[in-house]
A protein has these predicted regions:
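Active-site/ligand-binding-proximal alpha/beta "capping" segment
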Residues: 149, 163-164
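Flexible, glycine/small-residue-enriched loop-and-beta-strand segment within the central core
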Residues: 66-76, 81-150, 170, 175-184
Length: 184
């Protein structure tokens, strides 16, 4: 099994392996092109975004600059809007449901490194998938940690650090994020 296949299967993988490095290289090229294209040039913008994030609904939009690990592990639903300055580390897979809004400067991070310091010295990580449901809103500067699921129609307050699952229809905020109240 190649290291890329291990990554796709959610197993520990060597992030310095040639096949993973090639995925990162392609992303660097596509990301640089996307971040250089004018948002106002619709055709060039759509082509650059599709090259960077091939698994997206045509109505999903990202304001540059935008940063990611691979791009091909991100799925964006209909009407998704991602504001400027966001970073998505997507080795574990990131799925964002329809009509979800992501505020500026958000970080969605799927990589998980070993707890043991000696193991952590090795170039190995595991990607834990992150799922954000439909009709969610993440305020500016939210960080979503590996393996988290945010339920549909939830709102995460600006600057929050989401370290555990959030039920649907929740208003949550803080570091660590706690549910403040139900929305429905």
């Amino acid at each position: 099994m190649t290291e890329m296949e291990k990554m796709l299967a959610g197993e520990p993988f060597d992030f310095t392996a040639p096949d993973v490095a090639e995925s990162l290289r392609r992303r660097r090229v596509n990301q640089a092109h996307f971040n250089a294209v004018s948002f106002d040039d619709g055709k060039a913008y759509d082509e650059a975004l599709s090259a960077l994030i091939p698994h997206r609904h045509p109505t999903a939009r990202i304001m540059p600059p935008f940063y990611c690990d691979h791009g091909h592990r991100i799925q964006l639903g209909e009407g998704v809007f991602i504001n400027a300055g966001c970073t998505f580390l997507d080795c574990g897979g990131i799925t964002i449901g329809d009509h979800t809004l992501i505020g500026p400067g958000c970080r969605i991070c799927t990589p998980q490194h070993p707890i043991d310091f000696e193991e952590r010295r090795k170039p190995v990580e595991t990607g834990l998938p992150i799922t954000i449901g439909e009709d969610c809103w993440l305020g500016a500067g939210v960080t979503v940690c590996p393996g988290v699921r945010i339920g549909a129609r939830s709102i995460i307050g600006a600057g929050s650090v989401v370290v555990h699952d959030i039920p649907e229809d929740s208003l949550a905020a803080g570091n660590p994020t706690v549910v403040k109240r139900k929305l429905r």
